[in-house]
Structure formats: structure tokens, C-alpha cells
Amino acid sequence: MPPSKDQPNILRGPGDYEVTTRVHNDTYPEIDPRLLNLQGKSVFVTGGSRGLGRSMALSFAKAGVSKIAVGARSSLESLAKEIAEACVNPPEFLPVKLDVTDEASVAAAATEVGRAFGQLNVLVNNAGILGKYGLIADSDPEEWWEVLNVNLRGPYLVTRAFVPLLLKASKDDIRYIVNVCSVGAHLTNPTLSSYQVSKNALLKLTTLTNAEYGPGVITFAIHPGNSPTDIMGGPEAIPPHHKHVFVETPELSGDSVVFLVSKRREWLGGRYINCTWDLPELVSKEAEICIPVGLYQAKEYVDIPFNGLRPEIDTAFQGRKQRTPEQARRAQLAKYNVVKGGMDNRRDSQIFIRIKRSTKHNPRLVRLVGNKSRPATSGICRVDFFDCTAQKQRDKAQWQSLKLSKAQVTGSVVTHLTQILSGNSQRTAGIQRARELGQIIWPLAAEQSDSGNSLP
């Protein structure tokens, strides 16, 4: 079991104990890879000669993958033998000599895997290093940058080279990129600047990769747990007062990754997943975490990533009551509109026209997309589940005129609608309240507001 909440934990991250009611430090029966069937799938894992990568390769083999390639700089003979002994029907195993920081080496690896497998279903960017501890002013620039070279440039080069192989797989099949990140992406621990910067940047690379290739290729990041592997110098290198923190096993992350990619789960795209969370419980909360978009992207999901930065301001989990299965089902099946297209967000009349056009086709509104080029006037323009709840008495007639009176509000407020609904005198207070609720976050991509897509 990970350390309890009341114990000191220098690596306690956002949402560690809040996302699921149970947490784990070792694998558990519900995610046993032998219960899954990945027959016919092909997988490539980087940094697989030891530690987490080795465990992931073994977990995939136990799940029945047909082909598995592992990239590493060191020998993979012992891993090949272990895979053969662990499986009744061992997969085709391809050892690949790989330096993730070398573009030519990565390109050669992609060519080799493509020639042997033809396509790819899962890519795991696992290779990484910790680097030396030290204050920034005392650090060696080459050593400091080498950590980013391995932890960020490496996943970039590998993703760049292997995406074409993922795209060759059937659109209906599983196609995943899993980036092995770290809770360190969210922490600020002096003397670990290079490592934590690299992992924070890897989170952004994850969301961007998913934005560019999802939902066809689903990209998400994991925190594997705090395992005392070789990257830490092994268990003996952990100081006595921190040993209670480094308790997760490599098998936990290996089995967790296999469980997550065993089915197509578009809603995982762009997210950060902590492997200590109870994953069956997590996937059961899909309807709580995601809101399907109806008008333009029927199979897409609204961009509310749980990136773990501050769970208390994360719309994916804040203020949500536990729903019954039937309530969750209805929420998941519900379709919502997205207001898109060019308009002058400084003019209330144009905002009202846009809302009316949207609600003509669907009486519910999920999101009003603002113009990112005018942050002072449009700000974040996220509006989730509107109705007259917040302004029930004063603005009921106005909401009804917009056909929005039957929706539900979670508290999200956009600058202009705060002004419209609350009146100019209440605008500042309304915006401040929205910030307190943690809803004015994550500016929307410019292409979503400036794409030129207009409503019918």
C-alpha cells in the first residue's frame, strides 16, 4: 500500500488519493494480463532491458500479444528467455538496438520493426534517466541537458518515427502511444530541475500528440508509481526516511499499461494516469470524467483533461457527486453542442445569436469557444452544462428564450455570459467567483475558435 495521507511523502502528487477510493502498490487480480486477450497485436517498448520497461514487455507477453519488439542499448537475451518461459504461446520477439537520443538509430529501429511487423498497435516510450542531483547554478550544462535529451527528445524522435506504423493498423483496432512520465512533472523538488522539467514537458508532448493524431491514435501519460528501480540506484540507494515512499513494484506499472490499452478508450487521450489508482474503478468513471460532444464531433470528447496539476480546480473531478450506473449511462449518452465559428466576442448580441443558432439544433450547450487572440475580452470561454440554476429567478425568462432552461450548470462562467446574465455591476464578482471555483483554466486552442466553421 502507498504511504497513507498522514505520512510525510515528498513525492505526493495531485489526485493521489482522491481519484479512486482504492490505491495499490503492487499488481492485483483485476488487472492480471493473463485475463486479457491481445492476440494479433504488435507492441514496441523502449528502454526494455530492465526495470519498468522489462516488466511492461513481460506483461504484454502474458496478455498474448503476437509480436513484441523491445529497444535498448544493452543486451536483451535474458528478457527473451524470460518471455519464452512466462508464456504458453510466446510472442515473436524482436530485440532492437536503440539509442533514443540518436535520430539515425531511431529511424533504423522503425525500419526494422516495420519490416518485421508491418504495423504497430502499441508504442511505449519508457526509456528515461534521472540525472544528477544539484542546484541549477552548480550543474553541468551538458549533464543537465542530457536528461532532457533522453526524457523529452527521445520520446519525440521515437513517436515521430513510429507514428506511421501505428497509422497502418486498422482504425477499429487499438492504437496507442503510452508515455512513461512521473509524478515529478507536477512537483517542485530543488536539485531535480532537469528531471522534473523533462517530465513536465513530456506531459505537454503527450497532449499535443493526442491532439494531432487522436482519436485514431490515442496518446496518454502514466506515472508508474515510485519504484526503487535502477534509475534510482536500486533499493539500497533509497534513504531510510524515504523507503516508505518507494514501495510500488514494476509489475504494477506493467500490468496497468496492458490493462489500459487492452480496449479502445478514446477518453484516455491526452491524460495523465497514476498507476497506483484502482484502474477498474477509474474506467468505471468515464461518464464522470468525460462529456461527449455532439454537433461536430460525435465520437470526440470535450477537452477537459485531468492532468493532475491541481485536482481541486480540475473540472473533471471537482464537485461531481457519485452517480448511479443509470445516471452515468444517461450522462454518457447525452449529446451536447459546441458553439463554433467567428464572431466578435465583445458584442453581447453576437454571442446571443451564436447561442441561439446552436440551441436551435440541440437545447444543450457545452462550450462557447472564444477567440484566443483577445484574451482580455474573451478569456477562457468554457461553459459546461448551462441553465438557469445559478440565475434561477432573475434570468429565467432570458434562459428560456435561449432554450437552455432544462440543462444543468456546474458553475462554469465565461466572461461575457457573466456580464450578460449577472449585469455589469456583478461582472467582476462573477468572474472572481468562477476563478475561485477553478473553472477559468486551460485556454482553448486557437484553431477551435478561428477555424471558420459556422453553424447551419
Curated annotation (Swiss-Prot):
CDD domains: SDR_c (cd05233). This is Short chain dehydrogenase tazN. Short chain dehydrogenase; part of the gene cluster that mediates the biosynthesis of azaterrilone A and other azaphilones, a class of fungal metabolites characterized by a highly oxygenated pyrano-quinone bicyclic core and exhibiting a broad range of bioactivities. The first step of the pathway begins with the non-reducing polyketide synthase tazA that assembles one acetyl-CoA starter unit, five malonyl-CoA units, and catalyzes a series of Claisen condensations, methylation, PT-mediated cyclization, and finally releases the first hexaketide precursor through the R-domain. The active site is at residues 195, 199. Belongs to the short-chain dehydrogenases/reductases (SDR) family. Its EC number is 1.1.1.-. Disulfide bonds: none annotated. Induction: Expression is positively regulated by the azaterrilone A cluster-specific transcription factor tazR. One of its GO terms (molecular function) is oxidoreductase activity, acting on the CH-OH group of donors, NAD or NADP as acceptor. InterPro entries: NAD(P)-bd_dom_sf, SDR_fam. It comes from the Eukaryota. Pathway: Secondary metabolite biosynthesis. Keywords: NADP, Oxidoreductase. It comes from Aspergillus terreus (strain NIH 2624 / FGSC A1156). The lineage of its organism: Eukaryota, Fungi, Dikarya, Ascomycota, Pezizomycotina.
